[in-house]
């Protein structure tokens, strides 16, 4: 005797997916894969942007480090250059032989100044200007009523900058109005 299966043809049809169900499943899988692909693409683009930003940041840092290194090296040359300028200022008051030597030193000084210029270092003058703490260091204050307060009366050391950024501020003497108590007592003495 042979056994017949207990399943009917209706049951077989329900266990097999219908074409509509299969289409829905495939569409859902397709949508999931598209979403996953978009997510992976977004991650890739973010990683690419981060890498580009890192590259730019490192390049900027490298450029700044080089600029600061150049500035520091140039700053070391400022005192000897200024000493040479002062010495050359006295050369005109000496013998012909010293004057001839001074011409050679003047040429050397010009070469230094040319290097500074090529590197963007600019000397700025301060006398007669208004005091700016970003560009000046007040090392002396003189009370006066004839010159507006904050005006620079004398420059002890020159200031130098690259672009708008000072690499060495000028050391200066600044005018200040006398305190009211001081001006009254000065008038009484006269």
Curated annotation (Swiss-Prot):
Q: Which Gene3D superfamilies match?
A: 3.90.20.20, Head domain of nucleotide exchange factor GrpE
- What residue spans carry the region label Disordered? 1-21
Q: Name one Pfam family in it.
A: GrpE
Is Chaperone one of the keywords? yes
Q: Where is the composition biased (Polar residues)?
A: 1-18
Which SUPFAM superfamilies does the entry link to?
Answer: Coiled-coil domain of nucleotide exchange factor GrpE, Head domain of nucleotide exchange factor GrpE
Taxonomy, superkingdom:
Bacteria
Task: Give this protein's Gene Ontology molecular function annotations.
Answer: adenyl-nucleotide exchange factor activity; protein homodimerization activity; protein-folding chaperone binding; unfolded protein binding
Q: Which GO terms describe its biological process?
A: protein folding
GO cellular component terms given for this protein: cytoplasm
Subcellular location per UniProt equals: Cytoplasm
Checking InterPro entries in the record gives: GrpE, GrpE_coiled_coil, GrpE_head
Record keywords, A-Z: Chaperone, Cytoplasm, Stress response
Say what the protein does: Participates actively in the response to hyperosmotic and heat shock by preventing the aggregation of stress-denatured proteins, in association with DnaK and GrpE. It is the nucleotide exchange factor for DnaK and may function as a thermosensor. Unfolded proteins bind initially to DnaJ; upon interaction with the DnaJ-bound protein, DnaK hydrolyzes its bound ATP, resulting in the formation of a stable complex. GrpE releases ADP from DnaK; ATP binding to DnaK triggers the release of the substrate protein, thus completing the reaction cycle.
Q: How does it assemble?
A: Homodimer.
Annotated family = Belongs to the GrpE family.
What protein am I looking at?
Protein GrpE
Which organism was this protein described from?
Chlamydia trachomatis serovar D (strain ATCC VR-885 / DSM 19411 / UW-3/Cx)
């Amino acid at each position: 005797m042979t056994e017949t299966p207990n399943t009917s043809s209706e049951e077989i049809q329900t266990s097999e997916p219908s074409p509509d169900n299969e289409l829905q499943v495939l569409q859902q899988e397709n949508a999931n894969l598209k979403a996953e692909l978009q997510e992976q693409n977004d991650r890739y683009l973010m990683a690419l942007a981060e890498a580009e930003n890192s590259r730019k940041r490192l390049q900027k840092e490298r450029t700044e480090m080089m600029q600061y290194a150049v500035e520091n090296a140039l700053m070391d040359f400022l005192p000897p250059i200024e000493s040479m300028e002062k010495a050359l200022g006295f050369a005109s008051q000496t013998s012909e032989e010293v004057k001839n030597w001074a011409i050679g030193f003047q040429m050397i000084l010009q070469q230094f100044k040319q290097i500074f210029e090529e590197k963007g270092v600019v000397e700025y003058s301060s006398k007669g200007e208004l005091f700016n703490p970003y560009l000046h260091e007040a090392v002396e204050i003189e009370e006066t009523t004839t010159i507006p307060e904050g005006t620079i009366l004398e420059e002890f050391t020159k200031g130098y900058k690259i672009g708008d950024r000072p690499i060495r501020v000028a050391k200066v003497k600044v005018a200040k109005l006398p305190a009211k108590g001081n001006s009254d007592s000065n008038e009484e003495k006269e």
